[in-house]
């Protein structure tokens, strides 16, 4: 199979990158006002037998208070993947609101067996009209 002429005409972008070369590490979670526990299932695993990133995000969202989930939509997500999780690991999803309006939360996912932090994240929520 030959590469088509359209692809051959493509040129790399020059100048500044869209994303910075290095991303800042999010702060740790000092206070845990909302928590939920999960056990890693087979359906949470990718082909390498690690928990996939979709499961991590689902667990973070599940730790957000129901009153926020019922009245808002996830508008922004910033996430740092720090370590891997595996089948049958017990994971604690914890979060704490950054502001009094509950529009932003800091999150942490921790493997309970050894206390290893797996993920840090920040979510921003927008009220449903």
State the predicted function of each range:
Residues 37-41, 80, 124-126:
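Generic structural detector for well-ordered beta-strands
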Residues 1-73:
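Hot-dog-fold acyl-thioester-processing enzymes
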Residues 62, 76, 80-87, 92:
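Extended serine/threonine-enriched, polar tracts that run as long, contiguous segments within proteins
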Residues 42, 62, 83, 127-129:
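Non-catalytic surface loops within mature trypsin-like serine protease
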Residues 1-24, 28-30, 85-87, 97-129:
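HotDog/MaoC-like acyl-thioester-processing domains
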Residues 74-76, 120:
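Hydrophobic residues on conserved beta-strands that form the core of alpha/beta folds
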Residues 48, 73, 83-85, 101:
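Short amphipathic alpha-helical interaction segments
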